[in-house]
């Protein structure tokens, strides 16, 4: 922690005090000054084991506004499967924490595990009584997210997929809300009571 603070302070000081360093206009755009290498496009600081690249031109992220309505999801089901219970527990904690940080309601349940057994010969050229049995246990976790917009779902899914641990698979099922098509008429059961009332009179 202290080392990170020292390097952060050093980087800020170099960034603010970069006006004091002179950049010579030689064949290359790199100048050497007291063990520091400076470039016009990138400020590069070198110590014995420290390399800090600080971009000179920081661009602000652009926000785009589109006229299209955002996609609405009624439910987003994320099924995660793996072979190690501790890894799944840790990933479940991470995914729930990320969902709560984004203000998404999440429910977690654990489907029953699946066990596959293979009984094989110990070697190809051996008698049948010499066998070995292999067992694969697949554990599952299911995260149910409800009432999401398309942009929130995309951000959340990209975040948890980038941090997916090794040996863990993910399956995502999306249930989208859509408007009722115009070609579908009114339900038949709304018109039936009126016809029955007319036939009685």
Swiss-Prot record:
It is found in: Mitochondrion. Keywords: Mitochondrion, Ribonucleoprotein, Ribosomal protein. This is Small ribosomal subunit protein uS10m. Gene3D superfamilies: Ribosomal protein S10 domain. PANTHER family: MITOCHONDRIAL 28S RIBOSOMAL PROTEIN S10, SMALL RIBOSOMAL SUBUNIT PROTEIN US10M. Component of the mitochondrial ribosome small subunit (28S) which comprises a 12S rRNA and about 30 distinct proteins. GO terms for cellular component: mitochondrial inner membrane; mitochondrial small ribosomal subunit; mitochondrion. Its main location: mitochondrion. SUPFAM superfamilies: Ribosomal protein S10 (SSF54999). It holds the Pfam family Ribosomal_S10. InterPro entries: Ribosomal_uS10_dom, Ribosomal_uS10_dom_sf, Ribosomal_uS10m. The gene is MRPS10. Belongs to the universal ribosomal protein uS10 family. The keyword Transmembrane does not apply.
């Amino acid at each position: 922690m202290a080392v990170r603070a020292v390097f952060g302070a050093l980087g800020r000081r170099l960034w603010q005090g970069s006006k004091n360093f002179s950049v010579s206009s030689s064949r290359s755009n790199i100048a050497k000054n007291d063990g520091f290498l400076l470039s016009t496009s990138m400020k590069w600081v070198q110590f014995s084991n420290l390399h800090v690249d600080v971009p000179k031109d920081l661009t602000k992220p652009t926000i785009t506004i589109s006229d299209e309505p955002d996609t609405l999801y009624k439910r987003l089901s994320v099924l995660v499967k793996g072979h190690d219970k501790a890894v799944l527990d840790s990933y479940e904690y991470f995914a729930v924490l990320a969902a709560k940080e984004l203000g998404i309601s999440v429910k977690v349940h654990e489907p029953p595990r699946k066990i596959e057994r293979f009984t094989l010969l110990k070697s190809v050229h051996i008698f049948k009584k010499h066998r070995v049995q292999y067992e694969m246990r697949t554990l599952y976790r299911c995260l149910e997210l409800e009432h999401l917009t398309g942009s929130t779902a995309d951000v959340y899914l990209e975040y948890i997929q980038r941090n997916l641990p090794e040996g863990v698979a993910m399956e995502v099922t999306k249930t989208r809300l859509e408007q009722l098509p115009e070609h579908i008429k009114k339900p038949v059961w709304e018109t039936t009571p009126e016809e029955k009332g007319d036939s009685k009179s």
